[in-house]
A protein has these predicted regions:
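Active-site groove signature of glycoside hydrolases
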Residues: 1-14
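The substrate-binding groove and active-site-proximal loops of carbohydrate-active enzymes
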Residues: 11-28
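Glycan-recognition surfaces
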Residues: 23-129, 140-153, 160-163
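Short alpha-helical segments and helix-capping/turn motifs at coil-helix boundaries
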Residues: 32, 93, 100, 179-180, ...
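A structural micro-motif
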Residues: 43-44, 219, 308, 318
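Carbohydrate-binding surface patches
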Residues: 107-110, 115, 154-215, 250-257, ...
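Catalytic cores of secreted or luminal carbohydrate-active enzymes
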Residues: 108-173, 218-275
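Non-catalytic C-terminal accessory domains or segments of carbohydrate-active enzymes
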Residues: 193-196, 225, 230-340
């Protein structure tokens, strides 16, 4: 850790020193990091730490975008940079009851750097489950070329003057979020759907057109952490109160079809976006392919609309352990003895 700090922190500071020697501070900083890059090679991950470092664009793979401590705010203040300029690092995730669900969720939905730094014994407890469901992080890119909260990036012109070595600086990501919704579109060959993460804010209705969805269509809304199908809605839906057990909400929103369909799965917060390889409806049979994990119960949540009656569930490579109807969906639990 000390070696990392020696290499990547502080060398962009003290402009008076470089001015007295009539040296270009940015050039000196880049030359130093270039030497490190040449030594470790392109295959090694290099992160700038901490604070926004536009001087190192093209050299570093990731950047801690703010000060010490996980920053929800930074994910919206520099969303346009993520996986375009570099990989955003909101800082390490703490698997505490207060932060485990919402921090892992926000990091994964935004496609940011996912770093756990808890004591090993924590990973033997149930609090590790949200991290398991949020990993791996899918590669995502921002859907817009602007920052949702531009309050910090609008100060990037100060980068040449705010280099004292202390911080946070006016352009570094802050710790105070102004937005609480994170939207991720999942586009697969067999289906498209959206995920909406909520970390706080007001409990008010969310219009579908503000999520880029057709307000004239009907959508199933499934809350991932509680595994509750909230219902089928047109125009908008009410998210309800955040459960203090999770401190966040994650909604999977799928267009309602006129036949049984996958509502969600439990393996990953994308509700099938990671492990589902194919889903189809033919001859009144819902079929598909999925990659499962050994000894980890895999749950399919399938709609059962009016006019249809569930008959049976069969699969190869896993055993059907339980089938249970809950409201207007079937919960199918599978168990696999091997990965695949």
């Amino acid at each position: 850790d000390a070696l990392r700090h020696l290499r990547y922190e502080g060398y962009n500071s003290y402009p008076d020193h470089f001015r007295e020697k009539q040296k270009d501070r940015v050039e000196a900083f880049r030359n130093l990091v270039k030497a490190v890059r040449e030594e470790i090679g392109r295959e090694s991950f290099m992160m700038g730490c901490w604070g926004i470092m536009p001087e190192l664009i093209g050299l570093i793979d990731g950047c801690r975008i703010g000060t010490d401590g996980y920053s929800f705010a930074g994910l919206s203040q520099y969303n346009s940079f993520n996986n375009v300029v570099w990989l955003n690092d909101p800082d390490h995730i703490e698997l505490s009851p207060e932060e485990a669900y919402r921090s892992t969720m926000a990091t994964s939905l935004t496609g940011s750097l996912f770093l756990l730094t808890d004591k090993p014994e924590v990973y033997r407890t149930n609090i590790v489950d949200p991290a398991k469901r949020a990993a791996p992080v899918l590669f995502t890119q921002p859907g817009q070329i602007y920052d949702v909260d531009p309050s910090r990036s609008q100060n990037l012109h100060l980068v040449d003057t705010e280099v004292t070595g202390s911080g946070p600086r006016l352009f570094d990501a802050s710790r105070t979020p102004t937005v609480h919704l994170f939207l991720l579109e999942i586009n697969r060959p067999f289906e498209n759907w959206v995920l909406l993460g909520c970390t706080g804010g007001e409990d008010k209705n969310i219009p579908f057109d503000e999520l880029g969805l057709d307000p004239s269509k009907e959508y199933y809304v499934f809350e991932f952490w509680s595994k509750i199908l909230m219902g089928s809605y047109s125009g908008e839906f009410a998210p309800g109160k955040i459960d203090p057990l999770f401190n966040c909400q994650l909604f999977c929103i799928r267009e309602r079809l006129d036949h049984p369909q996958i509502i969600a799965t439990n393996r990953h917060i994308t509700c099938g976006g990671y492990e589902l390889d194919d889903v189809r409806w033919e001859d009144h049979i819902l079929s598909g392919k999925s990659r499962v994990i050994k000894n980890d119960p895999y749950i399919l949540y399938v709609s059962e609309p009016p006019g249809y009656k569930f008959k049976d569930a069969r699969c190869t490579g896993a055993k059907v352990k339980k089938i249970e109807k809950t409201g207007m969906m079937q919960k199918i639990v599978l168990h696999a003895d091997n990965n695949g």
